[in-house]
Amino acid sequence: MWVFNRDGFFSAVEHRDDNSNVMVRARAKEDIENLSSALQENHQLLDEDTAPVYTPDGDYHYRLTVSKKVWGEYLNSAANDLDYDNFKNSVHGQSDRDSAYMGVWSAMYAFQTSRDVNETYGESDCPEPNVK
């Protein structure tokens, strides 16, 4: 699961050694520190419970382990704390991060456009959206 929010960018996966936990990875030290701080504030976790680990040989250099329950509570809090109508504007300000996030936005826009073309010509097996 990829998550982009004001705390940063995270990739969360089930911990390979303990399926009750989630390994949350980040590419930037600032992001994993923001997450660690948020977890400590919102979930009364001790420092050692949310201490980021530096893994220079890993695909993601920064990691921490939390229970699936705590990760779910964090995501729920992030959703409930939404107070903006444009994510890109809400995180604007760091040129390297702006560029990276715009790259993700652009890649997914291109993906959407290619799907739209396929749907127009009946070549997509993508189901119709369920809008209510």
Please place each PLM-identified region on the residue numbering.
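Structured alpha/beta or helical-core interaction and ligand-binding surfaces enriched in interleaved
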Residues: 1-132
